[in-house]
């Protein structure tokens, strides 16, 4: 007879401590990268979302060479964190300010806490936080750990000092085992790609080797921040409606509930919905049965006349900033970008943006350089499993003037949504949702058409140059004949006139063709005044 089974529950902290790879911490190299990423994303959400031009300083120091322990410190000038929220914000898994119906870089209330858990598994130093909210006269300091069994913060140390400098923002330092040589290229690439789409930010990065990289602010223009909106009927399920009902502050009728708590439902639409469900408009919403809630959700899914979800909850990068970032980093000959109109999937609004850069200083490769972004987060790992890569790979680039397998091109795609369909909690690749895939393809085709037009005009220009340059071989004969005609028999004037005619013709051709060194062409065609 088999032994009796033992049953037990796990706290969220214990679950992710046992399964760190699910949160993007499978090994020291990835853990170091993921820690940097999570802290930078928190800093950006604390700045640009609130209309603050980001100043972000990232430092990685090797503090224990024998054990390869690194200290990652990120400092921002954001809104800061209320001191009463700091312990839970950093010490309770699945506790977050990002459980709202608007676009955020974070989603799960997991990121930085996963770094703390990984840190605790391998060394004993607590996470260190310094923060001062906007207009606060105090600077608050904390040292924290996580009680893994209880999923609660352990406050190792806390204090506050007078804030005499007017500083507002947050500094977070985490000591973590890492592999800098293996993580180095990914971390540098992540910061560079973040800068491409946030050219309004300033980044200073000091790596463990002592190298300092400065990314200057290129503009003071910040994209419109996302606004929190009510849920769309298409995007809710039974349990979400039950939670909404339980959280109501007053005793609504079902019609009042529909009109006040959802977007896209006005008086007429509410009446139509309730008629389809078979509910009286004046029935108290808290008296709904389980079966009635089920019918309501099913009606939501089938109803075809809802307005599309509001895009106010989204924040795009914008075409100007996309091209500004691409030009700064890649120095191309050509850039184009597009911000598509809002669409929706499963009741969640989304917008696709695309950019393309061609030629110039872009290195030639067998594949284009693909920059993937989701809610303004660069996606560095798992590239080939992402829907963006799938669309780029399947697009017939030859139709758009790319005639060889040697690409000198950067392709950028940004997806923003209130719900990004990531393949895992590590947030590195986007799933193949049909509506999203279609929009990505449409966006890329649109910028590809702009590239095709540019390449077509460039080829026509080159052909025109060839034809005009072909006429150079006639310059000596034509200039001499004109000089003889103008000299009217005075042979001494012929060289003078011929020289003036040659110079005039070459100035005209040089201006017409925008040639920098016309002398090289004079040597080729042996055109000199006599």
Curated annotation (Swiss-Prot):
Presence of the UniProt keyword DNA-binding in the record: yes
Ligase among keywords: no
Top-tier EC class: isomerase
Gene3D superfamilies cross-referenced by the UniProt entry: 1.10.8.50, 3.30.230.10, Histidine kinase-like ATPase, C-terminal domain
Record GO cellular component, one term: cytosol
Keywords noted in UniProt: ATP-binding, DNA-binding, Isomerase, Nucleotide-binding, Topoisomerase
Residues reported to bind ATP: 42, 76, 97-98, 106-113, 427
PANTHER family on file: DNA TOPOISOMERASE 6 SUBUNIT B
Self-association state and partner proteins as the record states: Homodimer. Heterotetramer of two Top6A and two Top6B chains.
UniProt name for this protein: Type 2 DNA topoisomerase 6 subunit B
Originating organism: Saccharolobus solfataricus (strain ATCC 35092 / DSM 1617 / JCM 11322 / P2)
